[in-house]
């Protein structure tokens, strides 16, 4: 397992040097952020990013993400051209030696929260989705701008996209468009040596009348059966799936591990109910997820891949502008998960490897 950390490029207030100082940190999860959605990523852009990360003593373990254009999701006539561009990006990621691409197939926006600073009992704040906040709200009729929405759209464009989904695209239509996309890109991913890892819908249930399809156990089974290859895998985001109390994330994790189809791990904890959900500290007791149980499964199945602590509370005066992506709580989470990993590895009679090659610099006796 390679502990990894999301980094938003040169504009991220969290620096690579700060990330490198987290004990046991090996990988960076990042993307090319200056290429418009739908265009192919040039190889030189990827190599420049890779060099920057490697000069800091880290490696890019996952690209998160190459966004899927809405016209692909909606099955529009120009989707083949857009898919060819996507395939070019996959080839270039493979040529750069990066093994995994995380992506999603969520309509319009990547994730939705109603509150970025909801208080927790420990005095910190975190991201929350409170259904009561959105009761009776319509993003088409109301002047609404929620966290996680794609800022590349104007409000009028976003309203048009939402209306098209509502009127013309059912969940089965979205499934059909996803299948078309998967069957088009997977041979390229296999040839390039890149494993694809679809992220679940966040939250994993319908909102605003939009179709949502990657939501739970049955959806994961259906998705994996679209194309039978280890390159067609999932991002096991336990926090996203656990945001719906109906999902048994331990059972889902074991199912996907048995099929060797977890290509990336996101680990955040949540507490959830009929009211919605709130993200918590990573500790098992802080939320609904048995995090030790999750890590034990990874060890039991000898899972080899990148895991990143996903989202963090706002603590210790963290002023990051990207919700959930401050340094401090994610660093605590990384250390916590490395501790769980070492404990479970040693209990299984195995020796964990955190990639630490040099234990000191200079004269040990000085």
Curated annotation (Swiss-Prot):
It catalyses: D-mannonate = 2-dehydro-3-deoxy-D-gluconate + H2O. GO terms for molecular function: ferrous iron binding; manganese ion binding; mannonate dehydratase activity. GO terms for biological process: D-glucuronate catabolic process. Its EC number is 4.2.1.8. Pathway: Carbohydrate metabolism; pentose and glucuronate interconversion. It holds the Pfam family UxuA. Its cofactor is Fe(2+); Mn(2+). Keywords: Iron, Lyase, Manganese. It comes from the Bacteria. Belongs to the mannonate dehydratase family. Catalyzes the dehydration of D-mannonate. This is Mannonate dehydratase. It comes from Streptococcus pneumoniae (strain 70585). The gene is uxuA.
């Amino acid at each position: 397992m390679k502990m990894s950390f999301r980094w938003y490029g040169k504009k991220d207030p969290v620096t690579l040097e700060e990330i490198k100082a987290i004990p046991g940190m090996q990988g960076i999860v990042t993307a090319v952020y200056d290429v418009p959605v739908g265009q192919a990523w040039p190889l030189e852009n990827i190599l420049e990013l890779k060099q920057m990360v490697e000069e800091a003593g880290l490696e890019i373990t996952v690209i998160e993400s190459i966004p899927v254009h809405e016209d692909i999701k909606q099955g529009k006539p120009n989707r083949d051209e857009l898919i060819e561009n996507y395939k070019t990006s996959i080839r270039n990621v493979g040529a750069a030696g990066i093994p995994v691409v995380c992506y999603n197939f969520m309509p319009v926006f990547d994730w939705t929260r109603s509150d970025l600073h909801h208080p927790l009992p420990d005095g910190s704040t975190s991201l929350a989705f409170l259904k009561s906040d959105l009761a009776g709200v319509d993003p088409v009729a109301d002047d609404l701008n929620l966290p996680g929405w794609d800022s590349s759209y104007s409000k009028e464009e976003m309203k048009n996209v939402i209306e098209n989904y509502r009127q013309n695209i059912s969940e089965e239509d979205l499934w059909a468009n996803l299948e078309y996309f998967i069957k088009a890109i997977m041979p390229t991913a296999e040839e390039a040596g890149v494993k694809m890892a679809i992220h679940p819908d966040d939250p994993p249930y319908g909102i605003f009348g939009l179709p949502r399809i990657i939501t739970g156990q049955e959806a994961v089974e259906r998705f994996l059966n679209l194309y039978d290859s280890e390159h067609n895998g999932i991002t096991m985001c336990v926090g996203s799936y656990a945001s719906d109390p109906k999902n048994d994330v331990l059972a889902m994790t074991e199912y996907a591990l048995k099929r060797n189809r977890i290509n990336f791990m996101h680990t955040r904890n949540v507490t959830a109910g009929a009211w919605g959900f709130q993200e918590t500290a990573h500790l098992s007791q802080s939320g609904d997820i048995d995090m030790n149980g999750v890590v034990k499964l990874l060890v039991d199945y000898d899972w080899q891949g990148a895991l990143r602590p996903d989202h963090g509370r706002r603590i210790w005066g963290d002023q990051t502008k990207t919700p959930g992506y401050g340094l401090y709580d994610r660093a605590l989470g990384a250390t916590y998960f490395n501790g769980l990993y070492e404990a479970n590895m040693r209990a299984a009679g195995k020796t964990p490897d955190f990639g630490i090659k040099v234990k000191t610099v200079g004269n040990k006796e000085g």
